[in-house]
Amino acid sequence: MQRSNVLVIGNSGVGKSTLINAVLGEERALTGYGTKGTTDKLESYESDSLPFRIIDTIGFEPTFLKEMSAINAVKKWSKECAKEGKEDNQINVIWFCVDGTSRKLFPKAIESLCKATAMWKTVPVIVVITKSYSVPERKENIEMVQNAFASQKKYAKNVKKILPVVAATYELNETAFAAPEGITELIDATNELMPEGLKAGVLDLANFKLNRKRQLAHGIVGYEPVLYLNIAP
């Protein structure tokens, strides 16, 4: 049975790997602390308890070269899907992870998301607000995400859900902890969107192949007259 695919994407240090481990129910993805990411290539994770595969990505970094490296890694994975026999790698749902403690979502992060997933123009997106330790701030963070995407109307239509999540127990102080929360809701939301995502993945992949054929055809047509002119007496 073909598994669907969920792409997990976002800035370095937002907690993508911790989120993946929480969804899998075991420590599989390498985790770290601070703003430096721990994933240096795309990794695929499966579990018998999940109907979908999870694709972890390289986090977006502030520097241009590292940012482009992360974007190009996703684009390369996506283009591999167009090869014969690789269609089961198509992306069906995207989890865009945002740090709930930062209180900001910069347009650049959304732009990086758009560039990296440009091939998947109609695939549904769930914005996952990680590290949502403060319950009172969750509503503010949801509004923050809504406002940030409002300025990116072309991509905003793909955002289907915004979910605050606590992926691992977090110590607030000596006597208080933030318990894991929102993981079941995230899995349920993903499963609900998957029928739409499966159709979107097939459509986007077909459109990519069609556009590539057109580009190749234009390239050949454009080349022949030049070749003819060069060899004509």
Model-derived segments and spans:
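Conserved protein kinase catalytic core
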Residues: 27, 62-63, 102-105, 136-137, ...
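Conserved G1/Walker A P-loop phosphate-binding module
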Residues: 1-64
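Membrane-inserting effector segments that mediate pore formation, membrane fusion
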Residues: 217-233
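Canonical P-loop GTPase G-domain recognition
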Residues: 123, 133-199
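Regulatory, non-catalytic segments
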Residues: 212-216
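Short glycine-rich substrate-engagement loop in P-loop NTPases that contacts/grips substrate
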Residues: 34-35, 67-74
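Short, flexible loop/turn segments with low-complexity composition
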Residues: 196-211
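Conserved C-terminal guanine-recognition region of P-loop GTPase G domains, centered on the G4
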Residues: 49, 72-158
